[in-house]
Amino acid sequence: VPTIFIENDVIAKSTTEQLDELAKNTVSLTEKFINDKLKANSNDVLRCNEIQIDCDWMASSKDRYFTFLKAIKKYSDKQISCTVRLYPYKFTKEMGVPPVDRAMLLCYNLLNPKNHSEKNTILDLEELKKYVQTDNNYPLPLDIGLPAYSSCYMFVNGKFDEVRHAVPENLEEITVEKTGKLWYTVERDTSFKYDYYKGGQQIKIERVSAKLLLDATKMIVDNVVLDETLLSEAAEKA
């Protein structure tokens, strides 16, 4: 499914006319991408029946964002979906419900890595539970997005410096000691897998294990009302 990410600031600072033009251009360019790039081996256009919009909207920008989504639906004959983070999933009265055909619930990036030093901020079951254990049944068919990536947070003199993704499996080999649950100290200045690490630098490595994904999936299935089609497909693949 082609997914288009749009910054919330773009939505928040646009007029109704600009949002309409943005929607028109978004649909046009996406259709061109599908026709030009997504070719099957037989040279037929790969079937694509859905366009997904990804935007971390806020309560203050929801009206503009929903106006944009309505315009997307106006200009496209495809099913329109959008991503929904856990906060708007739980607090629908504050955040509203997007005017789309279905939603992708993003169950990752639950915490700010700068503020939660000892937790896995990509996926933490205690934090996930706070959002999925709710009496609020979301009024859209839901798909689920789970993390399949890793992150390495770099700190210099105790201050956050940068983040790197797709962490090499054996990155721990360049560390001299483990200083916390997820924390390591780089042994010496090292070039490793095309990246440079400075000796003495603190790094926090976050990965998502298969067990953690399975535990998160069980929690979601037990608490979130999912599309029956999605559940049937998952059962067939199990």
Which residue ranges define each predicted feature?
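Glycan-binding loop/region signatures in secreted carbohydrate-active enzymes
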Residues: 154-232
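A structural motif corresponding to the C-terminal end of an alpha-helix
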Residues: 32-47, 75-76, 130-142, 227-237
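Acidic-enriched, low-complexity/disordered segments with a strong bias for Aspartate over Glutamate
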Residues: 7-9, 20, 36, 44, ...
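Glutamate identity and glutamate-enriched acidic tracts
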Residues: 7, 17, 21, 31, ...
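Short, exposed beta-strand "edge-strand" segments with a Pro/Gly-rich flavor and a Y/T-containing core
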Residues: 13, 116-123, 202-208, 224
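Substrate-binding surface in catalytic domains of secreted glycosidases
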Residues: 67-172
